[in-house]
Amino acid sequence: MKFAIVVNINREDALELAQELTSWLQERGLSYVLDSVSGEKTGIEPSMAMEELNKDCDAFISLGGDGTLLFTSHYSVTKPVIGINVGHLGFLAEFSKAEMFEAVEQVLNGTYSIHVRSQLEAEVTMNGGLKHLTALNDVVIEKGAYPRIPTFIIKLDDELLSAYRADGIIIATSTGSTAYSLSAGGPIIAPKSNVFVITPICPHMLTVRPIVISDDKTIQISVEAHGGEFPLNCDGHVSKMLLPGETIIVRKSEQIINLVENKNRRYCEILRSKLLWGHEHQSGS
């Protein structure tokens, strides 16, 4: 088995962990390769372009946090991904540094379990043709530098849902419900729920609320405004600047992400830890 290793190069502890991991793999005669950016920063060989890793490797190891794992997921396709969190417990990167070798051994022995995560697909026009962008967490359209409040026209399966006056619109998966959508007032959705959530960002009216829809719906979004350009973000990365009247289509992607499950963690435990639920009770006990 060959592992692809992706490192958060901006964290010293992640770089150190990469040295530990590759030494451990070498001692056991196991194959690995880093993406070219991680390889250059760590000085570890071999390395190759991120786009080539999936064809050459059997599993991915992400060293960093949820952001690093999100980045890795865009290239892993259906290969299993081990998320090692070098900081605090993550929603996606479930394994701690101390659990890293155990996680790798589970994959080697075939004794691991998988969290299958759905993705979003955004269909947009780019460079004169259609392009399909994927997002594990969310697809977001924001007002950007536009000085007024734009109107976001949203249709579900060609039926008008509403015209939202807001600073932006978030379309999130159940996985992404604990990310930007949660900060904007959206609900927490259990990972295996077959739904998406549409969450307005700072809506103009108090009656505008997030709405949960089944993931078999097709969502059409366009922006009404007098000029301006509006950033389209997929998992936090600006993919395109939308013009007024331009329509994007968001639906469930056929591509899934396979995250290696930490059997020592439970979903409710992760929620309590990350969101400090019951923290006062624990402090007072």
UniProtKB/Swiss-Prot annotation:
Keyword Lyase tagged: no
Binding site residues for NAD(+): 66-67, 137-138, 148, 165, 167, 178-183
Q: Which UniProt keywords apply?
A: ATP-binding, Cytoplasm, Kinase, NAD, NADP, Nucleotide-binding, Transferase
The record's annotation in SUPFAM superfamilies points to: NAD kinase/diacylglycerol kinase-like
Q: Which cysteines are joined by disulfide bonds?
A: none
Gene Ontology molecular function: ATP binding; metal ion binding; NAD binding; NAD+ kinase activity
So which cofactors does this thing need?
A: a divalent metal cation
Entry EC no(s): 2.7.1.23
Q: Which residues form a coiled coil?
A: none
Cellular-component GO terms for this entry: cytoplasm
Q: What does this protein do?
A: Involved in the regulation of the intracellular balance of NAD and NADP, and is a key enzyme in the biosynthesis of NADP. Catalyzes specifically the phosphorylation on 2'-hydroxyl of the adenosine moiety of NAD to yield NADP.
What protein name applies here?
NAD kinase
Source organism = Prosthecochloris aestuarii (strain DSM 271 / SK 413)
From the broadest rank down, the organism's phylogenetic lineage runs:
Bacteria, Pseudomonadati, Chlorobiota, Chlorobiia, Chlorobiales
